[in-house]
C-alpha cells in the first residue's frame, strides 16, 4: 500500500481513520486546547465495546482491505462486537483481501492468535468468508459427513475448543515460555488439519482419520510458506507438535509403559512439556468418565517424564556406542549398515531391553553385526 500524502484538515484526517475508536483527537490550538474532538462518537463505541467505521465501511475497507483484518483483530483483542453494517461489509469486501501481502496478513493473524480468546476472531473470519481466503484447509474441518446414520464430530469447533484450552493453560505453572506461546497456539490450530485428507469410512468402525497427524505435519510447511510465516525452527516446532500429538493420547489410552514414555521423550526432546500441554488440551470428550481416565493416565505419563528428567534422560536415552565408533570398529564408511546397527542399539535402550552401558550394548552389537555378515576384522 502506497497512499498519497496530502496536506489536509483535522476533519480530513479523522475521515480517513479506520475505526471510530481510532478517530479521536485532542485540540492543540487556541482556546480549544485540550478539547476532545470526537465527530463519530468514538468514546461511546469504546464504552459500549463496538468496532465501527467512521464513514461507509465499503469505502473504508476498499481504501485498505487490510482494515478488514484489523477490524477482526481489534474485536478479538478488546472483546468488542462488530457493528452490523461494518460486519456486513466484511463479507462484501472479503475478496479484496487477495491484494494484501501475505506478510501483512500474517502479522494480523499472529495478533489474533495472541488475544485472550482467539476463537472469537476465528468466528468472525469464518462467518465473513475471510478465513477461506487465508486458511481454506481450516474451513474444510467444518464439513461434517453422515453415513448410515453415523456422523463424525465437527473438527472445526473441536479445534477452536482445543485452541481455547491451550490459551487457558497459559496461566498454569507448566505453561510454555513466552517465546513459544504463539507457536503452540498455531500447533493447536493445525493439530487436526490433516483430518479432511485422511477421512475414510469403515463399515465397522465408522469414520476414521488414520495418519492424520503425519499428513497434517506435512501440510504445516506448505501453509507456513504460503502465509509468509517463518520457515525456521518455529515452523519445525509446530510440525513436531502436530506430528506427535496423538502419541501421548495413544499411551494414555492403554497401560502407561516405561518403554512408550521413553520413546515419546526421545522423539519430543525439549518440547515434551509443550506437547503434553497440547495433548491435554485435545481431550474435549463430553464423556466425563473417559475424560477423567485420560487425564489420570496423563498424570502418570508426566510422572514418568519427570523421573526420566531427574535421571538426565538425554544421557540415558542416547546409546553410549555411537555411529563413529561403529564405523571404526567394522571399517565401514557412512552407509545403511551403520544406520541399522545404530537403530538396533537405540531401540534396545529405549525399550529398556538392556542397560545403556558399554558391555551389554557391545554384546548386542556383535550379535546383530554377525547376522549381517560383518566382523571386526574384515568389516563388510
Language model: regions and residue ranges:
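Catalytic cores of the polymerase beta-like nucleotidyltransferase superfamily
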Residues: 1-380
Amino acid at each position: 500500500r502506497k497512499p498519497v500524502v496530502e496536506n489536509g484538515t483535522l476533519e480530513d484526517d479523522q475521515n480517513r481513520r479506520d475505526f471510530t475508536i481510532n478517530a479521536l483527537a485532542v485540540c492543540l490550538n487556541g482556546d480549544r486546547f485540550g478539547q476532545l474532538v470526537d465527530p463519530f462518537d468514538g468514546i461511546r463505541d469504546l464504552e459500549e465495546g463496538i468496532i465501527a467505521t467512521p464513514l461507509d465501511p465499503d469505502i473504508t475497507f476498499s481504501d485498505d482491505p487490510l482494515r478488514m483484518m484489523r477490524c477482526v483483530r481489534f474485536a478479538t483483542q478488546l472483546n468488542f462486537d462488530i457493528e452490523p453494517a461494518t460486519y456486513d461489509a466484511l463479507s462484501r469486501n472479503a475478496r479484496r483481501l487477495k491484494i494484501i501481502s501475505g506478510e501483512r496478513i500474517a502479522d494480523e493473524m499472529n495478533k489474533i492468535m495472541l488475544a485472550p480468546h482467539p476463537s472469537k476472531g476465528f468466528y468472525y473470519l469464518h462467518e465473513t468468508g475471510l478465513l477461506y481466503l487465508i486458511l481454506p484447509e481450516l474451513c474444510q474441518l467444518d464439513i461434517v459427513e453422515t453415513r448410515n446414520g453415523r456422523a463424525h464430530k465437527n473438527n472445526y469447533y473441536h479445534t477452536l475448543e482445543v485452541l481455547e484450552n491451550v490459551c487457558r493453560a497459559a496461566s498454569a505453572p507448566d505453561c510454555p515460555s513466552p517465546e513459544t506461546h504463539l507457536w503452540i497456539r498455531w500447533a493447536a490450530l493445525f493439530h487436526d488439519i490433516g483430518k479432511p485428507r485422511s477421512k475414510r469410512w469403515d463399515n465397522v468402525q465408522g469414520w476414521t482419520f488414520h495418519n492424520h497427524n503425519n499428513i497434517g505435519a506435512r501440510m504445516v510447511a506448505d501453509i507456513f510458506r504460503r502465509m509468509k510465516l517463518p520457515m525456521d525452527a518455529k515452523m519445525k516446532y509446530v510440525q513436531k507438535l502436530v506430528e506427535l500429538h496423538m502419541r501421548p493420547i495413544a499411551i494414555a489410552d492403554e497401560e502407561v509403559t516405561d518403554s512408550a514414555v521413553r520413546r515419546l521423550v526421545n522423539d519430543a526432546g525439549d518440547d515434551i512439556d509443550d506437547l503434553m500441554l497440547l495433548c491435554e488440551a485435545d481431550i474435549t470428550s463430553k464423556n466425563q468418565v473417559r475424560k477423567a481416565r485420560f487425564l489420570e493416565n496423563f498424570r502418570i505419563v508426566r510422572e514418568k517424564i519427570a523421573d526420566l528428567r531427574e535421571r538426565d534422560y538425554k544421557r540415558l536415552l542416547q546409546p553410549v556406542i555411537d555411529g563413529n565408533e561403529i564405523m571404526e570398529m567394522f571399517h565401514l564408511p557412512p552407509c545403511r549398515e551403520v544406520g541399522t546397527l545404530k537403530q538396533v542399539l537405540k531401540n534396545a535402550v529405549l525399550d529398556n531391553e538392556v542397560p545403556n552401558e558399554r558391555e551389554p550394548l557391545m554384546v548386542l552389537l556383535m550379535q546383530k553385526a554377525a547376522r549381517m555378515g560383518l566382523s571386526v576384522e574384515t568389516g563388510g
